[in-house]
């Protein structure tokens, strides 16, 4: 690597550290010619697929747009920054793992909805309303009812319900 101070070709690594998330290596280097020290960052370069828009246009994947989508959906919601970042990373990971050169914007939207659903149901419905082009209140109601039907019942709830039914003289559902 060239020294940024004297442009000499020979530098040596004197220290290397891996970032907390394991995706970056920080290397401390020293120039063999002038003795100056500088740091470099080494990251994995993985090409993300090109996004094919609904109108047929193509554009490079932009993680900032993805983050903006999450931020808008979760605006003023009690979701930590770390959770949002993890959701963005999960979507990017899905795109990388697809192995495809192109991916439709609808699929990206589906990945976002999966992550939003895990984070915050209000944010999920906000995003779904734009993503699925809700036309009226009935569309909102339908999505909310679908979400409620698919929500898991707490593991402690069923035994309590069965016990209450048995106390009332009605057999439980076993």
From Swiss-Prot:
Domain ATP-cone: 49-139
Cofactor(s) listed in the protein's UniProt record: Zn(2+)
InterPro entries: ATP-cone_dom (IPR005144), NrdR-like_N (IPR055173), RNR_NrdR-like (IPR003796)
Cofactor: how and how many bound: Binds 1 zinc ion.
Keyword vocabulary terms for this entry: ATP-binding, DNA-binding, Metal-binding, Nucleotide-binding, Repressor, Transcription, Transcription regulation, Zinc, Zinc-finger
Superkingdom, taxonomy of origin: Bacteria
Molecular function as annotated in GO: ATP binding; DNA binding; zinc ion binding
A family per Pfam: Zn_ribbon_NrdR
Keyword Zinc-finger: yes
Zn finger region (unnamed): 3-34
GO biological process terms, semicolon-separated: negative regulation of DNA-templated transcription
HAMAP family: NrdR
Biological role: Negatively regulates transcription of bacterial ribonucleotide reductase nrd genes and operons by binding to NrdR-boxes.
Family: Belongs to the NrdR family.
Record's protein name: Transcriptional repressor NrdR
């Amino acid at each position: 690597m060239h020294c940024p101070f004297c442009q000499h070709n020979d530098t040596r690594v004197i220290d290397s550290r891996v970032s907390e998330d394991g995706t970056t290596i920080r290397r401390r280097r020293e120039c063999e010619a002038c003795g100056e020290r500088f740091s470099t960052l080494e990251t994995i370069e993985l090409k993300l697929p090109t996004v094919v828009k609904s109108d047929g246009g193509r554009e490079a994947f932009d993680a900032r747009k993805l983050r903006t989508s999450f931020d808008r959906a979760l605006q003023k919601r009690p979701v930590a920054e770390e959770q949002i970042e993890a959701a963005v990373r999960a979507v990017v990971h899905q795109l990388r793992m697809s192995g495809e050169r192109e991916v439709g914007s609808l699929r990206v939207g589906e990945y976002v909805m999966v992550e939003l659903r895990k984070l915050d149901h209000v944010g999920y419905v906000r995003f779904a309303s734009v993503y699925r082009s809700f036309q009226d209140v009935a569309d909102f109601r339908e999505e909310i009812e679908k979400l409620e039907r698919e929500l898991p019942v707490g593991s402690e709830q069923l035994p309590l319900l069965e016990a209450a039914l048995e106390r009332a003289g009605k057999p439980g559902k076993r």
